[in-house]
């Protein structure tokens, strides 16, 4: 590998890069860091046949450099084939905290396909190879999740864009989304219309019934509407906050667990204060 300092206009995004570059609080901190100290960790790039370099790891750093008013960025130039570059690109981004389900799904799929192609090439050149893990189980081990989790996420790439957006926005939970992903595209579009009509998204049990109806060839507008009109069982209460809104009230060193514990303590103190005022 070679170190270089190319101009930003010579750096091109990775084809079908699954991760968004979001202008959030974390990015604003990165931009400020780049302004003060420059890019500390060089990006990884590979040469393009058309000229310039393809970014393998460093899309957010390039954006930060652009916003900081820099013209160049330090990089490590590596001669990588497409599959090796894909694996590095995915691994370098999956370490981030805030990743959308759509990003994780596409990233897992890209890495799985790259590993399978590498395995196929090895099978052609090696007459005897010891038994290997399934590629999705291998990815799961590397990421600290099960192979089933990897397979479930990859199934989300079968969702139509409207439903995938609902999953990203947490309007549809992951468990029902895995079931919905098994529906035919036209059935998913039918579900989009039904969700709009009912102003409700399917629960896990409803999604499971839709999947069974689809497999039996019985899922149509009437059966879908009947399933969606069923009264849902009470689900476990959950509450989520936008990280950027909460983080500004805590020291930068605080972990999410420390933030949660602090919020609980403040709520307990608030509850005691209310109880005392009601007793007066």
Positions of the model-derived regions?
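Amphipathic alpha-helical extensions and coiled-coil-like segments
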Residues: 137-138, 143, 147-272
């Amino acid at each position: 590998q070679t170190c270089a300092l190319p101009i930003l206009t010579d750096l091109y995004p990775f084809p079908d890069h699954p991760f968004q570059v979001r202008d959030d609080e974390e990015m604003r901190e990165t931009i400020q860091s780049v302004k003060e100290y420059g890019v500390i960790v060089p990006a990884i790039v590979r040469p393009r046949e058309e000229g310039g370099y393809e970014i393998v790891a460093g899309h957010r750093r390039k954006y930060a450099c652009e916003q900081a008013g820099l013209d160049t960025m330090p990089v490590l130039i590596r001669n990588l084939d497409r599959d090796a570059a894909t694996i590095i690109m995915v691994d370098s981004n999956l370490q981030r905290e805030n990743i959308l389900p759509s990003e994780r799904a596409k990233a897992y799929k890209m890495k799985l396909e790259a590993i399978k192609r590498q395995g196929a090439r090895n099978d052609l050149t090696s007459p005897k190879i010891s038994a290997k893990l399934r590629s999705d189980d291998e990815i799961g081990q590397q990421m600290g999740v099960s192979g089933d989790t990897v397979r479930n996420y990859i199934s989300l790439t079968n969702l139509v864009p409207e439903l995938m957006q609902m999953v990203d926005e947490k309007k549809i939970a992951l468990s029902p989304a895995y079931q919905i992903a098994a529906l035919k595209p036209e059935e998913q579009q039918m579900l989009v219309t039904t969700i709009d009509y009912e102003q409700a998204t399917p629960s896990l049990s409803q999604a499971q019934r839709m999947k069974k109806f689809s497999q039996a060839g019985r899922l149509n507008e009437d059966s879908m509407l009947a399933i969606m009109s069923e009264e849902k069982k009470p689900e476990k209460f959950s509450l989520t906050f936008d990280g950027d809104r909460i983080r500004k009230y805590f020291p930068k060193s605080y972990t999410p667990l420390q933030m949660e514990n602090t919020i609980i303590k403040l709520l307990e103190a608030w509850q005691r204060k209310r109880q005392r005022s009601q007793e007066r």
